[in-house]
UniProtKB/Swiss-Prot annotation:
Keywords: Membrane, Photosynthesis, Photosystem II, Thylakoid, Transmembrane, Transmembrane helix. The keyword Glycoprotein does not apply. The keyword Thylakoid applies. Gene3D superfamilies: Photosystem II reaction center protein H. PANTHER family: PHOTOSYSTEM II REACTION CENTER PROTEIN H. It is found in: Cellular thylakoid membrane. Belongs to the PsbH family. GO terms for molecular function: phosphate ion binding. It comes from Picosynechococcus sp. (strain ATCC 27264 / PCC 7002 / PR-6). This is Photosystem II reaction center protein H. The chain crosses the membrane at residues 29-49.
Amino acid sequence: MAQRTRLGDILKPLNSEYGKVAPGWGTTPLMGVFMALFLVFLLIILQIYNSSLILEGFEVDWTALGF
């Protein structure tokens, strides 16, 4: 049998909804939108790193980072 602790008693309300699932899609479309935006962000960073995205007046010198 599990031992009761003060921390467990404090955290118990956070786990009271365990096993309950909201009907329908819930916030899945919103999560998809944020995942797509994050993908665009990562692609922009990758293009800047590969110098395939040229920004006017913005020089990237990776040797200045000290690696």
